[in-house]
Amino acid sequence: MGQPVVVDSNIIIKEMQEGRSLHPIAKRIKKHKSKMVIPESVLGEVQKVTGNEADVIMDTIYEYCKYPVTMDKTDEINAESDRLVEQYYKCHYPDSLILATAKITGSALVSFDRELLQTAKLEGVQAFLPRNFVRWW
């Protein structure tokens, strides 16, 4: 099995609003026999922005990925998130939780947020813009 991949909320939001962003990522994950990881904080953020309930959001994800892994916050993820907020001036909640989830689970991270991607790289987490993930991962 390949490396898991954490998908940021901005990918799912863009998919729900415009389409086209999640499908190529899901195809790449499937090709590598990997898992798409959806942190609890991502679901919350997507709900807040789109106004959709969690089941509607998950239905959108299920269209392209049959078995995503939803990840609850753990004490370890919360502690890592707090450390990231303290260490990096530009790393805020909920981005810190998303990055902490990727780091603790050994996952790659896909996001449109360049500051989050930069912080991820400083933390040793593989991080990609969607187009680069589809092209190079």
Predicted features and spans:
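Short, well-structured N-terminal submotif of metal-dependent ribonuclease cores
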Residues: 1-38, 49-59
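Short, structured coil segments at secondary-structure junctions
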Residues: 32, 64-65, 123
